[in-house]
């Protein structure tokens, strides 16, 4: 935030109100956000590879799938929610909370399982914190690129985002293979270095707090539980979980039609392009 003088008075000027300045600020923010997303995804892919070994080491081989199931549930929920939270909470605050959560999860996971007896639930808690934290970077990257970049740069940065995801997924498998032969606990530390980006992001991310409306907490809760049960259904194929998920999604549909300011409006689901894209994804997934 800068200041300008007009008729003897000093007024605050938001650099993101100027297209040229906002483009420069966005580029400076996007690089650390992309690196954070890459390191977080790398850690995610690494644990997806070694979760059976981790389950055996913590004495719970039959529950090893929970190490990937719970973070997957969190990922499915936050991917949708973080984008909507940008309408209520400033990106600066959202990313700050995300990086701190990622750092806490990384340090907690390493210390609790390397210096003390490794435990299934300390692994799960740490991975949930890491997943929730790192996904903030991915969501913030897409929001910043969409809102503040010049049109000719948007395609470039969206391409970088896709390429970075594929690269991190590949390197994650490689890193897991190396670190698992030493100590899988070191996987927790991979994204911890991203806390160093916080000072840069505090200077380059917008501090506007959206439209001033209150966060739609009830809507987030209903949608979150519906998504959680749907994810659990695909992990355990328990039909009652699918039934609960459907009931909650129906309740969510009723809620957003009656709520004054839902975090997502019914008009979103009437978007024909979105419906076609989702239909194609479902066809390719199930056929």
Question: What are the language-model segments listed below?
Answer:
Residues 46-61, 145:
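Membrane-interface helix caps of multi-pass secondary transporters
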Residues 26-43, 48, 68-70, 105, ...:
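12-transmembrane solute porter fold
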Residues 55, 59, 133, 148-150, ...:
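Short helix-loop-helix connector
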Residues 182-279:
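Hydrophobic transmembrane-helix bundles of small-molecule transporters
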Residues 65-68, 72-75, 79-212:
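Helix-loop-helix hairpins in multi-pass membrane proteins, especially solute transporters
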């Amino acid at each position: 935030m800068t200041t300008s003088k007009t008729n003897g008075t000093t007024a605050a000027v938001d650099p993101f109100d100027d297209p040229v300045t906002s483009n420069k600020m966005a580029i400076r923010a996007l690089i650390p956000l992309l690196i954070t997303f890459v390191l977080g995804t790398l850690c995610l892919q690494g644990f997806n590879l070694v979760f059976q070994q981790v389950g055996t080491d913590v004495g719970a081989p039959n529950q090893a799938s929970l190490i990937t199931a719970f973070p997957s549930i969190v990922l499915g929920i936050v991917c949708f929610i973080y984008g909507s939270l940008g309408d209520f909470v400033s990106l600066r605050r959202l990313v700050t909370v995300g990086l701190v959560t990622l750092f806490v999860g990384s340090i907690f996971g390493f210390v609790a399982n390397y210096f003390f007896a490794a435990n299934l639930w300390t692994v799960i808690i740490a991975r949930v914190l890491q997943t929730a934290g790192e996904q903030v970077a991915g969501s913030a990257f897409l929001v910043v690129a969409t809102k503040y970049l010049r049109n000719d740069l948007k395609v470039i940065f969206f391409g970088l985002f896709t390429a970075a995801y594929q690269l991190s997924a590949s390197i994650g498998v490689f890193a897991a293979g190396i670190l698992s032969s030493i100590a899988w606990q070191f996987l927790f530390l991979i994204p911890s270095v991203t806390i160093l980006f916080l000072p840069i992001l505090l200077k380059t991310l917008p501090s506007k707090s959206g439209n001033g409306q209150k966060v739609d907490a009830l809507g987030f809760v209903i949608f979150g539980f519906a998504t959680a049960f749907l994810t659990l259904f695909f992990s355990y194929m328990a039909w009652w979980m699918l039934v609960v998920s459907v009931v909650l999604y129906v309740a969510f549909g009723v809620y957003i039609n009656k709520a004054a300011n839902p975090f997502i409006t019914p008009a979103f689901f009437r978007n024909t392009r979105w419906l076609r894209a989702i239909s194609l994804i479902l066809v390719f997934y199930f056929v």
